[in-house]
Amino acid sequence: VTRVRELTGAGINVSFGHDDIFDPWYPMGTGSLRDVVFMGLHVCQMMGYGDIMNSCKFISTNAAKTLHLGDSYGVREGNPASFIVLDAKNYYDALNRSAAVRLSCKNGRALAETEPAAARVRF
């Protein structure tokens, strides 16, 4: 594993990703970028609140920069409406609780929805 904290601290763009989904090289791969960030934070020992809150950049804006997406990435008029909505208060909460994807849209079309879970703790 490379020195993610040091590289980002030096202003170098770092992004996370993977392409192994249920294959011989990584049979546990699900395609979940949340899992990639979760593992990356642990392996790189980036457990501070700020580290965790900023880690979404590794799979979003930093990844877009790595892929040279330019102005075609991000929420702005004229761009494709491709996004997910997580069942969480913020990004820390999303990682901490493995928040479900409530809505997944690609080019403005809803691909998948998940109803909120109802949970009760009984003592």
PLM features per residue range, with description:
Residues 2-86:
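His/Asp/Glu-enriched, well-ordered alpha-helical/loop segment
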